[in-house]
């Protein structure tokens, strides 16, 4: 895909549309009930695309977001991706049964690096076969900081052939998060139809817009409010 001019991106993207591209995230291994309540209240207020949470919080978020239009996303095999194929399939079914409407699954990076692409293919195909009949959006997390460009391309091709809804850069727990190079590469491989989610280290508007410019259609961040408020100010000045 041809890189868009940043002014064109801004001209064609409303504040509401930007908010609707953000996955509002709380994936820390610690926290209180108040953290989850705040996350959901903010997502409802700003009309973010979804809340991204660990599977144990799915039922709570479903209740808190009832009638809001905000989706509930569960992180599967998170953050290392080193679960078995069968374990990830169980986690996916369980999260959906509890009300998750989006699934973000971490691939088995080690299997990929050992050349065991059959394992990566199987876990992605299983996720798609579980999610699609349930009407659940499925995303594959590459954890790009650990992969060569060739490995990133391999996963994107497998994901595209399997019929995923999104490929995603990062968990936010790796050595680095999303960057322009990786998002552009992923967009080039999957083409214009499949979504590309940029996540990890996205804390300001400039970074978010740069990633959208090269093909990101979702932004995973815990800084969504700051990004949207900054965009409101930017649009006012135009």
Curated annotation (Swiss-Prot):
Stored CDD domains: DeoC
Catalytic residues in the record: 104, 168, 197
EC supergroup of this enzyme: lyase
Keywords: Cytoplasm, Lyase, Schiff base
Pathway involvement of the protein, from the record: Carbohydrate degradation; 2-deoxy-D-ribose 1-phosphate degradation; D-glyceraldehyde 3-phosphate and acetaldehyde from 2-deoxy-alpha-D-ribose 1-phosphate: step 2/2
InterPro entries, per database record: Aldolase_TIM, DeoC, DeoC/FbaB/LacD_aldolase, DeoC_typeI
GO molecular function, one term: deoxyribose-phosphate aldolase activity
Catalysed reactions listed for this entry: 2-deoxy-D-ribose 5-phosphate = D-glyceraldehyde 3-phosphate + acetaldehyde
An annotated GO BP: 2-deoxyribose 1-phosphate catabolic process
Enzyme Commission code: 4.1.2.4
SUPFAM superfamilies the record matches: Aldolase (SSF51569)
Chief location of this protein within or outside the cell: cytoplasm
GO cellular component: cytoplasm
Subcellular location: Cytoplasm
Annotated function: Catalyzes a reversible aldol reaction between acetaldehyde and D-glyceraldehyde 3-phosphate to generate 2-deoxy-D-ribose 5-phosphate.
Protein family per UniProt: Belongs to the DeoC/FbaB aldolase family. DeoC type 1 subfamily.
Protein name stated in the entry: Deoxyribose-phosphate aldolase
Gene that specifies this protein: deoC
């Amino acid at each position: 895909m041809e890189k868009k001019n940043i002014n064109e991106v801004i001209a064609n993207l409303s504040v509401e549309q930007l908010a609707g591209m953000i996955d509002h995230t709380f994936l820390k291994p610690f926290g209180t009930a108040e953290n989850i309540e705040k996350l959901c209240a903010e997502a409802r207020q700003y009309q973010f695309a979804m809340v991204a949470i660990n599977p144990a919080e799915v039922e709570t978020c479903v209740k808190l977001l009832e009638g809001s239009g905000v989706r509930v996303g569960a992180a599967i095999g998170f953050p290392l991706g080193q679960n078995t194929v069968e374990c990830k399939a169980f986690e996916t079914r369980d999260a959906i049964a509890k009300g998750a409407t989006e699934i973000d699954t971490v691939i088995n990076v080690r299997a990929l690096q050992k050349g065991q692409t059959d394992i990566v293919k199987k876990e992605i195909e299983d996720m798609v076969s579980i999610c699609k009949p349930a009407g659940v959006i499925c995303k594959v997390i590459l954890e790009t900081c650990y992969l060569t460009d060739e490995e990133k391309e391999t996963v994107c091709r497998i994901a595209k052939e399997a019929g995923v809804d999104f490929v995603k850069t990062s968990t936010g727990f790796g050595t680095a998060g999303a960057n322009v190079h990786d998002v552009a590469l992923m967009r080039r491989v999957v083409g214009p139809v499949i979504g590309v989610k940029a996540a990890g280290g996205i804390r300001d508007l400039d970074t978010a817009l740069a990633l959208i410019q090269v093909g990101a259609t979702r932004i995973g961040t815990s800084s969504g409010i700051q990004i949207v408020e900054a965009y409101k100010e930017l649009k006012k000045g135009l």
